[in-house]
């Protein structure tokens, strides 16, 4: 009999991926995946950029490049981070990855030994939890409120818990809740981090997708001790098919990520990096992101309005100012994993909330995505989901 490593017992198939297999059927209204709207992909511009790369530098594009990644693209990312996030950095402090998911995988492998503690928000991104589980950590969940992680609880844990090796957070439009940390909470967080000197993984795939309110500084922009590792991605602002993300960190930490990348992947895709770089040179990425924001902002508001009309008043849900997701909390006696089968009978798919808690011990929540469905399907799907919820209410 084949014997697998113990860590494989900790890794399960992604509930989201399994749902997407069902939700991809054309008759299903899917609020399950975190997928961008495909009609917004700039196919003609991407083709023009790809043609230019192959015409000008085809043999270079098809060859290996450095582990750090294509130099011109890293320069463009550094400039954008300065302009958008107030993060003062340069190309030397950026490592390209195959999506920010690879950056998450590297993070736990760089910092965590079996049994070490990873502090997370409760709930937290399911994909990060799955990536971290391969390193066999102990998760410590910090409660959240409408403004994100509760700092008093974080400090209590740091003061009393040994072997905390890293803290994982999404301060902007968090997955799954859509919540955003206000400026005072960010400042308090960095004050605590500087006191305890624990590495922080700041995952920011949605930061540019703000539909209302003011942009807030990244934690990395407040980092005076080199403790924050910033993860970015082109998946939400250009196209996930490129599988291009990046890590931004100070020298000592980034060197370890670089070693990990050399061992695990060698590099991100040369041709993909060159095409994205050429796209940024040839076209206005800010203009494209503005188009995305306009579309998703409208769909977010439409979902909010439809939930207000279709859901029972006992149901609570978040009111995101950006990102891709809303978080729905039902009465505790409703198991949303059981209810998901009922919703699928109505041709509606969502992600049950239990997967966003490492112990899977919260059963009454739902994550809804609003970026991928057109208006009429949002209205129809949320209305049908409201009927399913009502049928489960006491």
Where are these regions (language model features)?
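Conserved glycine-rich beta-strand-loop-beta hairpin in the small C-terminal domain of fold type I
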Residues: 277, 294-304, 316-329, 339
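PLP-dependent enzyme catalytic core of the Aspartate aminotransferase-like
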Residues: 345, 360-394
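Conserved core segment of the aminotransferase class I/II
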Residues: 224-294
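Conserved core of the PLP fold type I
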Residues: 60-197, 201, 207-225, 296, ...
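Short, conserved charged micro-motifs
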Residues: 334-339, 376-380
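A non-catalytic, amphipathic alpha-helix used as a structural packing/dimerization or gating element
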Residues: 72, 256-259, 290-302, 380, ...
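N-terminal small-domain helix-loop-helix segment of the aminotransferase-like
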Residues: 7-99, 106, 281-282, 349, ...
